[in-house]
């Protein structure tokens, strides 16, 4: 099942944007082939954090994660960051050899910053490159605004939904923004 051309898509929800003071509270992964066909998806993991950590969330995170039910799921979860890291490593290694896939998603550098701090073995399994859909979004805004405006975002702020939305957005840019030439077999 391992294929070096498979892509691993990831999304995390965090208590805030600063890995020095905030923590991971939800994470999920999806594996696609190089044509963006979904091959597998991980479990969606709510990562337990203490009330002390959750009570430090700002207004936006408190409201958003409260509305989605994530805050309650985090309180009820028994999954630690280390346990989730190992489960995701096990899942990922079934589909992709180590350091083969870029980390794929939207604003994925932010997830990577948290991974370096709280899930370093998982971060190390990825290639050092990122496939960041938000880069295409920023380019489309500047070079082809109608393409950028035609992307429909739901913004649920749930890890699995956000990954699926990122894959769909990448498909959109592939079809409407990237120039397609006859495809040679990947080497």
UniProtKB/Swiss-Prot annotation:
InterPro entries on file: Exonuclease_RNaseT/DNA_pol3, Oligoribonuclease, RNaseH-like_sf, RNaseH_sf
Gene3D superfamilies membership: Ribonuclease H-like superfamily/Ribonuclease H
Main location: cytoplasm
GO cellular component: cytoplasm
Keywords, alphabetical: Cytoplasm, Exonuclease, Hydrolase, Nuclease
Family, similarity comment: Belongs to the oligoribonuclease family.
Protein name according to UniProt: Oligoribonuclease
Organism of this sequence: Neisseria meningitidis serogroup B (strain ATCC BAA-335 / MC58)
């Amino acid at each position: 099942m391992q294929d070096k051309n498979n892509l691993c898509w990831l999304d995390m929800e965090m208590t805030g944007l600063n890995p020095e003071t905030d923590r991971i509270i939800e994470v999920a992964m999806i594996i696609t082939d190089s044509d963006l066909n979904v091959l597998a998806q991980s479990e969606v993991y709510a990562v337990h954090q203490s009330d002390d950590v959750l009570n430090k969330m700002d207004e936006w995170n408190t409201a958003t994660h409260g509305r989605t039910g994530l805050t309650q799921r985090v309180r009820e979860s028994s999954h630690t960051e280390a346990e989730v890291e190992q489960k995701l490593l096990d899942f990922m290694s079934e589909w992709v050899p180590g350091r083969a896939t870029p980390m794929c998603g939207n604003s994925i550098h932010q997830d990577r910053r948290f991974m370096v701090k709280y899930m370093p073995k998982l971060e190390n399994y990825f290639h050092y490159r990122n496939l960041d859909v938000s880069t295409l979004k920023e380019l489309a805004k500047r070079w082809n605004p109608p393409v950028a405006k035609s992307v429909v975002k739901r913004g649920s702020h749930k890890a699995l939904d956000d990954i699926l939305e990122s894959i769909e957005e990448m498909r959109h840019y592939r079809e409407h923004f990237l120039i397609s030439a006859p495809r040679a077999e990947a080497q």
